[in-house]
């Protein structure tokens, strides 16, 4: 009554009247309702939003937008609207001034509306000043205002059409103006303003259109349509992709996570300290003795470690990403509430159909409400999904960035516990787990909320009978809990097996050359398959568990429905199961099905993420290197004249291990050249590592003054151009760069490289020789122009004359670095007289230290060492360097032979690629060369010289053959059985629901329904058949998935191992690791799940359409066109989605390749202090990967919104046709039809998601199969051509007009080789760098097949027999000593062919018996990844032991004694002479003195044999061999 007086002066205008607004065929709102509610609703909305929006804008200032026509128009219209509203107000005052009695509403409403319009105008300007280009708040306000005005407009038009209507002309005119202006404001709000001034998007060449998209465009994801169209017309390329939004980049995301993690770690340490302190001072109990107190204190201190609080990574992730992610809570809650509107409207619709007297407009209203509700649900749901996916993407970016940064600083002991495989898995699999969790995590609270709301509405519908359903759900809880615990256990075991497999695959890929040379592929294949078998066992258990889980989860909603209906109809005969109760309940049960089905997935995802969270926390908590353990001072700082000062320092590789270096004390003055010498394993390399802070300093003081450069023993080369390897991130200074190139003897190499210094160097420098890699590594250090240089045997891998050149021009007293402090680890004695100080290492300690003369004078171990090894066998020694022997007191020391033992460790790869077609002839030229000349023009066919092949993305639709391949991998029987069981399950589901509709239409006789028991029994039986078929298809798909995983992995492994070496040189290891980790994980885990969900969604959609057509045949007019629209949109989407997935996969490989490369060279990166640059590179590669991922997730949303709109249309037409045909339809069929249509949207959404997931995930199968089509090497064994088991008996090797090239389009690197090597001959092979020495051995092992001619061993053409038949009969001691993780025995004898006694004998002959006997586990001692727990020299001795064990008739030594000290080298040479006395020995030598007693020497130059004969004869000829011997100081 109060509102009557408010709305009209005489109280005659009611606020609400049912007969006017509801119970009529032509409804309308009352005048009072129009003037109050319809005016106030938009005002209340804006005023409620204003304080929150104002606060948000004040905190999020994006910049200032200049006034535009759009902004000016909106502002002007705002003022006009304010004037129009207040014109109404002044008109009311004017009326009152004329004595007209007006209701208060005519003053209040215009005033409120006018002030609201001023507020709207103020917000338009505030948004402009804060850089808001399009406002959702304002668009919603204008939309609400328009909808309210629309209702008033309809009423005014209806009133105007009445003959006797009273018309208020002024207010009607102002209203029409108001309506028009609001409509214009709404239209203008749909457009976006220009970007703010100084916005980054202005300068971005290809900015993401999202940032400048309008609100409507963002809500409907319309802004990505341009990319979708481009992708539909032609395959997308990486250049088509937009830049990432700034807030999604690594630069923004990673530092925040790292900062929060450091805070959390510091916090946990502080809390730990508090706990420790509190435990030390316990309160003394009354009456207790002091002894009791002390005992209690001891107990507390002992228990303290149990109370250690680990830093919480979950808290850190929440703190970093929580604020943005919390928005998803709001959208999810809104969606969940809207979801229950459907069943309630369905209830009203069924009641409407039953009430034949109800006006038709009510049915249309319910239909419109269903449609609007469904559309809003769609928009809200996909905003929720978008936030979740973006959060997941940011988490993945942050995790990868944090792992990479941590990998650069963890200690060496920590690196042993986290292998490369594990760290790669952290970046690929574990980071992906967090992404997956982001989409599911909200279901933790959402699923229970949905269950509670559903049960509440079911209670209202069916009463206490619902408790039966609740009981069923409660019974399932412990079962789900047990399965979750089991799932976690299996997940941990699975990840452990996967880590081990990836670790082993990494080693295989890094050491593939050695595997091929030794014919060990099968042994390592079996090792990988054994680990894989364990992995598949766990997967199989998980699959069985998943099948049981699927059975319970699918059956639970049906059992809930069955038990509820059964109790409802049996407890009271008067309980009638009519259409309203049954189908509203069924709709609610269907809603209930989703949270119950999704919860197991959520639990599984949480379990997986918790495992990953723990793994990541452990890795990020590893100890870090302490650069502060070494005092670093700038050069300008005084602090004495010493560059390096070490006082009583002790170092260890791990705190738990005994010290590696102890009692180290020395000082090195600025500008000194210091040599470090000693036997293998004495701690020379460790000393350099200690100075680089790579080791733990236990005690002592270390001070370094100035910057440091480091040349490691094994050269680390990046997959980049030669120039970039040398510049190493520094600016090009042309003159200095040329000087470095010349000094490091690289000019001749550049002249033969196809593009000079721009030539691409393969991964790990595969296309450079060991010497070339070492020189590039040296040039990198020299170019950086540091104050202190640490050289770890840099002259080891180069020829004597090149070593001499480098020492003279770079390291020595007259070299480029003569004023720098240089610390040189060396085995060569020829340079020792020229150094300032010599440090002699023995057993991790400095045994002697002093100048060359001082050490000789002391007549200690060093002098004895020199006497033994400095007097060569050649009496006619020439002193090229003019070095004179120095006499020690009372003794005469013979003159040194310059360069007698100049060679050491070679680079990691045996393979020469382009370099072997060249020669290094004569002295290094000293002419000036410009960088333009250094960049030699490549051949016309650029691809001929392109070595590394980037991971390529396939284009176009995934071929049907890929699906067929996967089905064959599963097994055709299991494939078709799965489809049949799926079909049976969904037929049973459809029949059960149709049966329910028939039941609800049963006539009611005397207040009850007949045949209730039969109906219930059949309904139950159909449900049981559903359960059986569900279990059947889950089991079939899971087992089939495991079969497929096994077969695809075996095929991939077999194909990769059967690939020739050229394949591994062209293919970055990141690509291969990607296949064995991420792609295989997709096949293992994702594809079986996607198949189940895809098949389920497909049959659900077909079933829903069948039911709708059955209920309303008229729907056949609409469903086919909607189906066509659906199909077109889906195909339109898949064209882009598929390509985006491929681009994402391709851009993922460089992330892993760069990461692997970084791990291999981490000590070099740290030494040069280049961590920041490498972090930036890693971030850039991750961002490139996310540039492809982000559009793919948005494209998913784009598709879902459009397809759900198609689904919403099905809801609209199903309800509409039910209203139209209500007089001829039963309530049961209407209920069935509409309840199914309500599910269609969800089914369609899932079908499209799963079909696209299917296509995008099947790409993994495509990428695994990709390598089956690559070129393969010759068969390993050819039974019909197998040589006799005793072959070769003599060891005679003949080269007949032999020629070799590395690739078809390259020149020959060996030409017209004609030579016969008789059995038992000892032949040395020498030549300048790149002459083709190693190429000859590669040809002998058929690593590269001959281009012309043939090789005959004991009358058998080696090209005719199997590769393994050949390779097991020849033994090589390679340039690069490669060991694999596993026992020492496995590294010697992987096939377990020899007895322990034979193994020990080989170790004794290789001078390793004492060392191995001293190990805790002897032969079973575990070797670290890459054999890193042995020195390079010890690894080389293990390779010698392998050769001794195999004892074949032909032995090849490829610079095999490079990494050992002089004494060990002497022992090895004598071992080879005695143990291989009756064998044919081919030795590639840098140290010419080792082959001077050989039968013959072959001199190669430019791939041809230039000289051949006995060493003494060749010396007399004074040709190439003579000049090389002269360089080595042998003549």
From Swiss-Prot:
Residues of this chain annotated as glycosylated in UniProt: 1006
Give all N6-succinyllysine modified positions. Answer: 503
The topology of this chain with respect to the membrane is:
Multi-pass membrane protein
Q: What controls its activity?
A: MK 571 inhibits sphingosine 1-phosphate and leukotriene C4 export.
Q: Where in the cell is it found?
A: Cell membrane; Basolateral cell membrane
Residues spanning the membrane: 34-54, 75-95, 101-121, 134-154, 173-193, 317-337, 364-384, 441-461, 465-485, 548-568, 591-611, 968-988, 1026-1046, 1090-1110, 1112-1132, 1204-1224, 1227-1247
The molecular function GO annotations come to: ABC-type glutathione S-conjugate transporter activity; ABC-type transporter activity; ABC-type xenobiotic transporter activity; ATP binding; ATP hydrolysis activity; glutathione transmembrane transporter activity; xenobiotic transmembrane transporter activity
Gene encoding the protein:
ABCC1
Q: At what positions is Phosphoserine found?
A: 289, 915, 930
General function of this protein: Mediates export of organic anions and drugs from the cytoplasm. Mediates ATP-dependent transport of glutathione and glutathione conjugates, leukotriene C4, estradiol-17-beta-o-glucuronide, methotrexate, antiviral drugs and other xenobiotics. Confers resistance to anticancer drugs by decreasing accumulation of drug in cells, and by mediating ATP- and GSH-dependent drug export. Hydrolyzes ATP with low efficiency. Catalyzes the export of sphingosine 1-phosphate from mast cells independently of their degranulation.
GO cellular component: a single term: basolateral plasma membrane
Catalytic reactions on record: ATP + H2O + xenobioticSide 1 = ADP + phosphate + xenobioticSide 2; an S-substituted glutathione(in) + ATP + H2O = an S-substituted glutathione(out) + ADP + phosphate + H(+); sphing-4-enine 1-phosphate(in) + ATP + H2O = sphing-4-enine 1-phosphate(out) + ADP + phosphate + H(+); leukotriene C4(in) + ATP + H2O = leukotriene C4(out) + ADP + phosphate + H(+)
Q: Which family does it belong to?
A: Belongs to the ABC transporter superfamily. ABCC family. Conjugate transporter (TC 3.A.1.208) subfamily.
Q: Which UniProt keywords apply?
A: ATP-binding, Cell membrane, Glycoprotein, Hydrolase, Lipid transport, Membrane, Nucleotide-binding, Phosphoprotein, Repeat, Translocase, Transmembrane, Transmembrane helix, Transport
Annotated ranges, domain ABC transporter: 644-868, 1293-1527
Extract the coiled-coil ranges from the record: none
Question: Where along the chain is ATP 1 bound?
Answer: 678-685
Q: What class of enzyme is it?
A: translocase
* Presence of keyword Transmembrane: yes
Please give the name of this protein.
Multidrug resistance-associated protein 1
Task: Summarize where ATP 2 binds, as residue positions.
Answer: 1327-1334
ABC transmembrane type-1 domain residues are 325-608, 975-1256
Q: Which organism is it from?
A: Canis lupus familiaris
